[in-house]
Structures are given as C-alpha cells and as structure tokens.
From Swiss-Prot:
GO terms for molecular function: structural constituent of ribosome. InterPro entries: Ribosomal_protein_uL29, Ribosomal_uL29, Ribosomal_uL29_CS, Ribosomal_uL29_sf. One of its GO terms (cellular component) is cytosolic large ribosomal subunit. GO terms for biological process: translation. HAMAP family: Ribosomal_uL29 (MF_00374). The keyword Transport does not apply. Keywords: Ribonucleoprotein, Ribosomal protein. Belongs to the universal ribosomal protein uL29 family. NCBIfam families: L29. This is Large ribosomal subunit protein uL29.
C-alpha cells in the first residue's frame, strides 16, 4: 500500500489496518518459525507497511 493511498484514509481506518497488519505479521512470524513460510520477503513487507501506517497516523493526528 502506497503512502498516498494511506493518507486518503481516515484515522480510524488506519488504526484498523494497523491492527490487521500486526495480526498478519504475527501469523507470518509463526509460519517462519515453523518453516512453513515460503516467501520470507512478505514478512519484511508487512513490517514496513505497519511502520508506514504508524508514521502517517501520527501525521494525521497532529
């Protein structure tokens, strides 16, 4: 998800997306630990997406 798309969302929607992405990251970490995750780059992409969402949420709240 691009930053421009995130900025068009409302604060509540961004928070919901953060929760969803955090849950997905938890599941991906668990799959990685058990050796079931084939695409390990997906874990890093999700981590960066959460960081991007949190950064833009702070911008919106100011």
């Amino acid at each position: 998800m691009k930053a421009k798309e995130i900025r068009e969302m409302g604060a509540d929607e961004i928070r919901r997306k953060i929760d969803d992405s955090t849950q997905e990251m938890f599941n991906l970490r668990f799959q990685h630990a058990t050796g079931q995750l084939e695409n390990t780059a997906r874990l890093n992409k999700t981590k960066k997406e959460v960081a991007r969402l949190k950064t833009i949420l702070k911008e919106v709240e100011q």
